[in-house]
Amino acid sequence: MRFVYHPLAKEPTLKIEGESYIHLYRSRRIKSASRLDLRNLKDGFLYTYEHAEIAKKHALLRLVGVQPLEIMANKKTHLILSVIEIKNIEKILPFLNQLGVSKLSLFYADFSQRNEKIDSAKLERFQKILIHSCEQCGRSVLMELEAFSNTKEALKAYPKASVLDFNGETLPASADFEKGVIIGPEGGFSEQERGYFKEREIYRIPLDMVLKSESACVFVASIAQI
C-alpha cells in the first residue's frame, strides 16, 4: 500500500473509523509510532499524519507534513466502452487504472447486455475498486467514471472520439486517445451504429484473433502510453 485514501485528507486532524480502521489497525496492525501517508485523490498532494490516539474503534491523526507529488501516466486516455458484464468491468478496472486511463465512459450499445444495469450504486462500487487500486499502485488522481443510456448519447458527448472496429486502419500509437476511443460489445456494432460512425476515424487492432471487449480495453490503454 503506497498511501491511505481519505476524502478529507489535508485537514489538520482526521478520524479513521469503519472499514479503513479495521484494515489499518486490525489487519495491518499499524502502531501508534507509525506515520501514515494519505491522499484525497483530488489535489495531487501527499499528506503525512502522525497518531494522536488509537482507540478500540477509531484513530485520530494529526497532520505533520504536506508534499506536492503527482503520480499519473504521461498521456491521457479516454475509453468509451459499451456495457459488458458487470463482473468483467470490475475485473479490468484495476488494470485500466494502473495503465493511466484518465476517464472511462460506459454506454449501452445495440448489442449490449441490457440486463446489466449501470446505476449510481454500481458507479460507487466501481469507484471503491479504483480507490483500492490507487492505494496499491500509487496513482494520485482518481479515474473519472460516467454512463450513457445509448450509443447516440455517447457520440454526441464526444464528437471527436474514434472507433475501434474490425474494418478500420491499424491503431497507431500516435492516435489522439484523449479525445476518446469507442469500444463495442462482444457482438460488435450494429449496422445502424456503423452508420453513425461514417464521419469518424475507424481503427482496428492488428491481430487476427477476436478480442473480448475487456482485452481490447487493456490493449488500447497500453498502446496509448507508448
UniProtKB/Swiss-Prot annotation:
InterPro entries: Alpha/beta_knot_MTases (IPR029028), RsmE (IPR006700), RsmE_MTase_dom (IPR046886), RsmE_PUA-like (IPR046887), tRNA_m1G_MTases_N (IPR029026). Pfam families: Methyltrans_RNA, PUA_4. GO terms for molecular function: rRNA (uridine-N3-)-methyltransferase activity. Keywords: Cytoplasm, Methyltransferase, rRNA processing, S-adenosyl-L-methionine, Transferase. Its EC number is 2.1.1.193. It comes from the Bacteria. It is an enzyme of class 2 (transferase). Gene3D superfamilies: 3.40.1280.10. One of its GO terms (biological process) is rRNA base methylation. It is found in: Cytoplasm. It catalyses: uridine(1498) in 16S rRNA + S-adenosyl-L-methionine = N(3)-methyluridine(1498) in 16S rRNA + S-adenosyl-L-homocysteine + H(+). GO terms for cellular component: cytoplasm. CDD domains: RsmE-like. Its main location: cytoplasm. Belongs to the RNA methyltransferase RsmE family. Specifically methylates the N3 position of the uracil ring of uridine 1498 (m3U1498) in 16S rRNA. Acts on the fully assembled 30S ribosomal subunit. This is Ribosomal RNA small subunit methyltransferase E. It comes from Helicobacter pylori (strain J99 / ATCC 700824). The gene is rsmE.
